[in-house]
Amino acid sequence: MKGEPKVIERLNDALFLELGAVNQYWLHYRLLNDWGYTRLAKKEREESIEEMHHADKLINRIIFFEGFPNLQTVSPLRIGQNVKEVLEADLKGEYDARASYKESREICDKLGDYVSKQLFDELLADEEGHIDFLETQLDLLAKIGEERYGQLNAAPADEAE
């Protein structure tokens, strides 16, 4: 089915963000795991995989519209050098995605593409869940300090990889 070019463009814009998020969350997973934040690392891994599923849905929709998914470029990664920076970097990415998806859903609505609008609504709901988690973690980190936060997010030595 031939798709509306503006919708295909917005789907590719979202793919750009999701592919960057896959890589950023995966690298943060590996860094956090290495730093001993194994529980938070596990969450970052789960987020990376979820973002990969988002990318797959976008690719599928672009192909359905006889468009070409652009996997050549990804959004720039924001990589934290400590646990606080990791959380802040991820939060910035989620804020960017939320703003983009809000705009995209409106464009799809105006063009009468309710299925793509629904996809953006689904992505938006997931990103808002990520935002809530990250904001909560940053608030917790500020309240209890990095040392205690680290204790909460480290697995016992016999559970580490």
Curated annotation (Swiss-Prot):
Heme b binds at M52. It catalyses: 4 Fe(2+) + O2 + 4 H(+) = 4 Fe(3+) + 2 H2O; Fe(2+)(in) = Fe(2+)(out). Fe cation 1 binds at E18, E51, H54, E127. Its EC number is 1.16.3.1. Fe cation 2 binds at E51, E94, E127, H130. One of its GO terms (biological process) is iron ion transport. One of its GO terms (cellular component) is cytosol. Residues 1-145 form the Ferritin-like diiron domain. Its cofactor is heme b. Binds 1 heme b (iron(II)-protoporphyrin IX) group per dimer. GO terms for molecular function: ferric iron binding; ferroxidase activity; heme binding. Homooligomer of 24 subunits, arranged as 12 dimers, that are packed together to form an approximately spherical molecule with a central cavity, in which large amounts of iron can be deposited. Iron-storage protein, whose ferroxidase center binds Fe(2+), oxidizes it using dioxygen to Fe(3+), and participates in the subsequent Fe(3+) oxide mineral core formation within the central cavity of the BFR protein shell. Belongs to the bacterioferritin family. PANTHER family: BACTERIOFERRITIN. This is Bacterioferritin.
